[in-house]
A protein has these predicted regions:
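N-terminal phosphate-binding or glycine-rich loops at protein starts, especially the Walker A/P-loop
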Residues: 1-26, 75-125
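C-terminal non-catalytic interaction/assembly regions of soluble proteins
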Residues: 1-33, 322-441
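Glycine-rich oxoanion-binding loops at beta->alpha junctions
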Residues: 39-75, 123-173, 184, 219-228, ...
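Gly-rich Lys/Arg/Thr-decorated short loops/hinges at beta-loop-alpha junctions or inter-strand turns
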Residues: 77-85, 123, 141-151, 208-218, ...
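Short glycine-rich or small-residue beta-strand-to-loop segments that form or flank ligand, phosphate
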Residues: 81-91, 149-152, 173-179, 205, ...
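Short, ordered loop/turn segments at secondary-structure junctions
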Residues: 87-89, 117-122, 155-156, 180-181, ...
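Short glycine/serine/threonine-rich phosphate/pyrophosphate-binding segments
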Residues: 91-101, 124-125, 158-163, 181-189, ...
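Accessory alpha-helical/coil subdomains and C-terminal extensions
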Residues: 166, 177-179, 184-200, 204, ...
Length: 441
């Protein structure tokens, strides 16, 4: 049986042969053990039975290149000019990525011309008149203490040819793009346009999504911080719910199409009785539906805590077709919908409740990263630099099977990772909450 992993092309494009000895070689005493060969791979599928089956069939298991410094590099650091841009919504850890990239370029490779592009892809377009920032270790030294993005950001597409024109004018040899799925698709188009012009510009993506929904990336930066802070909101909601007869704490968390934050935070703070996510359908009415199940929970225990991802339950709304600046379909407010539906249901039952709705979304997005995410961002940023210095392009640096790897942009862009309703994470939620299917029949 062919798995989805076997069809993934894991080859990483390169601008040319890497012939320059890495300056890291002079600094490190570990010798060759410090460097990573392109032949060093990380298996995509870690299931031993499937690996044996693939090998017996005479095939080679699919694997990603392992990330890390190469002994030979493509670019001459003394003549190199680099650009870095952050795009899309805010996320804890953006400043950590910026800092890690700058420090590795400056101290690791001796690059002195590093430019920060202001306000996302707008910064490349002359009509917006955004200034470029010279990035040095002094400039980025303490930015990890702050939330948001030191360079600013923006949403929405910009003309690819204008972006490449700007890169040519600035004589950029290396572009680091930090962003989510839309940014990675834009990065793919930019890399293609660069190749069509026969330019020697490396494009390296660093995946950013607080929802942790980038395909072929097991963990994205900011997710750990989001879960950490979300558990505080769950704790607050639990205290509110227990403080009143028939108390209900309702927490709306981020997750447009993927419920990883809601599910993981619920498991981290196991006071949650219901978890509603986009990947798992549920009914509102009927004996097996959410409202009747909530009523039974209150009758049994006197309080309840509900966690809902922002993209859950969209079937209960009429489609408007409206989209935001990034092209995403505008979601209806499931938090307000549930609050109204719960209040109406128990009012008709003449059952008094105390309902509190908590939405920490924007607080979470704009916070500084926690310590775990800071470490993760450092690895991502430095490995992105190593990949670019080796002349690799149209690549993103990701985390897979507990290793940092090179993922082709074409393998990830335009696809989404979601919670598997039959997987271990969701089964753990069902065990922890006891909520059942919340479906009739």
């Amino acid at each position: 049986m062919t798995t989805e992993y076997e069809t993934i092309d894991t080859a990483i494009p390169a601008l040319g042969e890497a012939r320059i000895p890495s300056p890291l070689r002079k600094e490190k005493k570990q010798g060759e053990r410090f460097f990573v060969s392109d032949e060093k791979k990380v298996l995509i599928d870690s299931d031993a039975d499937r690996i044996v089956e693939i090998i017996r069939a005479g095939k080679e298991p699919s694997a990603f290149e392992m990330a890390g410094p190469r002994e030979m590099i493509y670019f001459d650091p003394s003549k190199l000019r680099c650009a870095l841009v952050t795009c899309g919504g805010l996320c804890p850890g953006l400043n950590g990525i910026i800092r890690a990239v700058v420090l590795e370029l400056y101290y690791g490779y001796g690059v002195r011309n590093i430019y920060g592009i202001r306000y996302g892809l707008q910064g490349f377009i002359p009509a917006y008149r955004h200034n470029v920032v010279d990035l040095t270790p002094n400039i980025v030294g303490d930015i990890i203490r702050k939330g948001g993005s030191f360079l600013g950001s923006s949403r929405g597409p910009q003309d690819v040819n204008e972006i490449v024109d700007s890169l040519e004018r600035m004589n950029i040899g290396m572009l680091f793009m930090v962003g989510g799925d839309g940014t990675l698709m834009a990065a793919t188009k930019i890399a293609d346009a660069i190749l069509e012009r026969n330019l020697k510009i490396s494009v390296v993506g660093i995946p950013k999504t607080i929802d942790n929904d980038i395909y072929m990336v097991s963990r994205s930066f900011g997710f750990d911080t989001a879960v950490d802070v979300s558990t505080q909101s769950i704790r607050a909601a639990h205290n509110e719910a227990r403080g009143y007869p028939n108390g209900i704490g309702l927490i709306k968390l981020m997750g447009r199409h993927s419920g990883f934050i809601a599910a993981t935070a619920a498991l981290a703070q196991q006071d949650v009785n219901f978890v509603l996510i986009p990947e798992v359908d549920f009914d509102m009415d009927g004996h097996g539906g959410f409202l009747a199940t909530l009523e039974r929970r209150l009758a049994d225990r006197g309080h309840a805590v509900i966690v809902v991802a922002e993209g859950a339950g969209q079937k209960f709304f009429e489609e408007t077709g409206k989209r935001d600046a990034s092209g995403n379909i505008r979601l209806h407010d499931i938090g307000a919908f549930l609050k109204d539906a719960i209040s109406k249901y128990f009012s008709e039952k003449k059952m008094e409740i105390s309902l509190k709705l908590i939405d920490p979304s924007y607080n979470i997005r704009s916070l500084p990263a926690n310590s775990n995410d800071h470490v993760f961002c450092s690895f991502l940023g430095r490995n992105a630099v190593h990949a670019a210095m080796a002349g690799k392009t149209k690549v993103l640096v990701g985390h897979w099977n507990n290793q940092f790897v090179h993922v082709p942009m074409t393998a990830s862009a335009g696809r989404r990772k979601q919670v598997n309703p039959y997987g271990r994470l969701w089964q753990s939620i069902l065990e922890a909450t006891g909520q059942g299917s919340l479906r009739n029949g």
